[in-house]
Amino acid sequence: NGKTWSKTQPLNDGKEFGAIQPVVLNYGNGKLQLLSRTENELVTQNWSSDYGITWSKMTATSLPNPNSGIDGVSLKDGRQLLVYNPTGKNWGDRVPLSLALSNDGTNWKRVLDLEPLRENTDKEGEEYSYPTMIQAPDGKVHIVYTWNRKTVKYIVLDPQKLN
């Protein structure tokens, strides 16, 4: 009805970046970061400093992405956690499935492979995709994702143990 929400202009033109399925990270005091998967072999970002009323131009991050789903959460300790496939070929491998941490949304460090690339295996059909995650009131992070397009996997971890 527009009484409790408003719509902004498109955040990209679809030409420079083919971006879809965004994730919003909250840094507090109105500062938001939008991360998107793309067909451009990387994750893109937009920033807002006014609670999402206006947004910066979409730009590339240093995070590789094979046009696969990502998810992120703003942790209670102020860090940002991202789950993603860190490969860069468009429609490329969706393995490994990894976690990256950032203090500022600009500098990301890959800290854990939830599903690593295994030695001596045929990668055909090996896929870990469409992740989603939350941080529960107890501080633990709960992650679910599609496993080999056959089932769903679930992981719980303590983000304080991630460096």
Could you say what each language-model-derived stretch is?
Residues 1-163:
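Asp-box/BNR beta-propeller blade signature and adjacent active/binding-site loops
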